[in-house]
Amino acid sequence: MKYDHLLVRYGELTLKGSNRKKFVNQLRNNVNKSLKGLDGFVVKGKRDRMYIELEDHADINEITYRLSKIFGIKSISPVLKVEKTIEAMSAAAIKFAQQFEENSTFKIDVKRADKNFPMDTYELQRELGGTVLKQIENVSVNVKRADHEIRVEVRLDAIYMYEEVVPGSGGLPVGTGGKTLLMLSGGIDSPVAGMEVMRRGVTIEAIHFHSPPFTSDQAKEKVIELTRILAERVGPIKLHIVPFTELQKQVNKVVHPRYTMTSTRRMMMRVADKLVHQIGALAIVNGENLGQVASQTLHSMYAINNVTSTPVLRPLLTYDKEEIIIKSKEIGTFETSIQPFEDCCTIFTPKNPVTEPNFEKVVQYESVFDFEEMINRAVENIETLEITSDYKTIKEQQTNQLINDFL
């Protein structure tokens, strides 16, 4: 079947009332950005849905795949746009039915948005179903459990007919909910947290704490790859890599061993808080999950949060670990996250970290040294990368160049 349009259904945009135009425009921008590099299509965003007009050479499978990854889209259907006549509808219905397997069942489903169309819903269903039965052998009607469902939408401008409905990612268009800073480690949780807030229309930039030589270049490349996977959904993402060695060593030098984990995370939060204001973000996002590890008890969260007045969003707070793993696999970050390269959260880990840190104690331990200068230096020396869906690390670029030189 050669389709001439893609029908794109909005997710929660129908709930946005007078603000819908803003959301539709943002979604259209996101669609154009996602489809960059492809040709043979025209995007037409309307109030209640979006249509993508396809030329003969358009790669419909690739376009549909990319659309399915965009937040704010509920579903996509390849459709035939036909004239508003029963003859045109009947001809299209026969085209669909010609692809049915022998002895299969079908039904006709009609939605009539144009109430002025001369035939009502039931008349159209009977007429089109009867035409298929007359023209196609060895098929029958089953309105309850049909093998195939020919869907017909009678709209003001034309009639759209389709069978397939491809699920989208749902949620809201990224760019409609403000900007946040994602604390991105190399673990399973934080990429999922980033994906969850993006699903709610939020733009992210990411911050990662790198402690060479204690953390390797492979650990850094792992985080770049996680960012690249997230960027497949939303376009380029800025990744801010913080040189954290100096701060981390000083924490381990002056803070009681049982409190180093708490203090280290407080330093991360102080750095993140400064960056939030620089980039114009409204909140910090992390992958913390209540009660999983010593740093993620309520006592720890209280002690760590105290260094910032910026809202800290924890999308995974109440998830079971298995739920997070399932989501990680669904979004494609799991295999990268489990690569065995240590990040700065796993080095210098005390054998017996305090699970209910006393806030006054951690402040007292940190008071013996003025960390502000080190924090400012870490912020000043941040390395910022813009990660796209086709981003390649320096190592990958060098490898490709060697291959090209060899060939």
UniProtKB/Swiss-Prot annotation:
It holds the Pfam family ThiI. Disulfide bonds: none annotated. GO terms for molecular function: ATP binding; CCA tRNA nucleotidyltransferase activity; tRNA binding; tRNA-uracil-4 sulfurtransferase activity. Its EC number is 2.8.1.4. ATP binds at residues 183-184, 208-209, 265, 287, 296. Keywords: ATP-binding, Cytoplasm, Nucleotide-binding, RNA-binding, Thiamine biosynthesis, Transferase, tRNA-binding. Residues 61-165 form the THUMP domain. It is found in: Cytoplasm. It catalyses: [ThiI sulfur-carrier protein]-S-sulfanyl-L-cysteine + a uridine in tRNA + 2 reduced [2Fe-2S]-[ferredoxin] + ATP + H(+) = [ThiI sulfur-carrier protein]-L-cysteine + a 4-thiouridine in tRNA + 2 oxidized [2Fe-2S]-[ferredoxin] + AMP + diphosphate; [ThiS sulfur-carrier protein]-C-terminal Gly-Gly-AMP + S-sulfanyl-L-cysteinyl-[cysteine desulfurase] + AH2 = [ThiS sulfur-carrier protein]-C-terminal-Gly-aminoethanethioate + L-cysteinyl-[cysteine desulfurase] + A + AMP + 2 H(+). Pathway: Cofactor biosynthesis; thiamine diphosphate biosynthesis. GO terms for biological process: thiamine biosynthetic process; thiamine diphosphate biosynthetic process; thiazole biosynthetic process; tRNA 4-thiouridine biosynthesis. Transmembrane segments: none annotated. GO terms for cellular component: cytosol. The keyword tRNA-binding applies. Its main location: cytoplasm. Belongs to the ThiI family. Catalyzes the ATP-dependent transfer of a sulfur to tRNA to produce 4-thiouridine in position 8 of tRNAs, which functions as a near-UV photosensor. Also catalyzes the transfer of sulfur to the sulfur carrier protein ThiS, forming ThiS-thiocarboxylate. This is a step in the synthesis of thiazole, in the thiamine biosynthesis pathway. The sulfur is donated as persulfide by IscS. NCBIfam families: tRNA uracil 4-sulfurtransferase ThiI. This is Probable tRNA sulfurtransferase. It comes from Staphylococcus aureus (strain N315).
